[in-house]
Amino acid sequence: LREFDRVSTDLVAAIEPNNAAVSVDSTVDSEVALEARVREAYLRGINTDVALGEQVKSLFGEVGIEPLSTRQYDHEKRTEPPYSEDALRSAKRKASGEGLADHETELRRGVDGETYDTLRRAWREMGREVIEQMQEESYERVETVPFTVTVGQVDSDAD
């Protein structure tokens, strides 16, 4: 933000996801709860503020940018028939556990070892259910990621 303040002569905008508030709805009953458990474990296992969007307005003020407006926009990622190649690949990664394996270090830091293995087994089972529903063309999933958009005015007379 300090760099925004330094290089801009007028308006700046910051668009930040609130990854702590991501929600999932799915036709696979276990997917919603498992997604939440995995997200919570991941967030405990990383050392990053994933909800920065809610703080941008005050952070603007701290560096001398006058906040003008803040709005939240929800981005929806839908999976429904006909399934894209990305959706099919995602289902395969769930069933194989590959998606969790990509973040195993962070997840293990967020849960104990036995819980990770239990979580991974449940995740793979859920992935197999996703594939079964996809074969029947009945699988639908909506992931909603809230984004905070903050616009501010740089004080160009401050130099």
Task: Enumerate the language-model features and the residues they cover.
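A short glycine-rich, Lys/Arg-flanked "PGG" loop and its adjoining helix->strand segment in the class I
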Residues: R2-A13
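Conserved catalytic/acceptor-binding region of the Class I
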Residues: I15-K94
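Conserved Class I S-adenosyl-L-methionine
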Residues: E66-D159
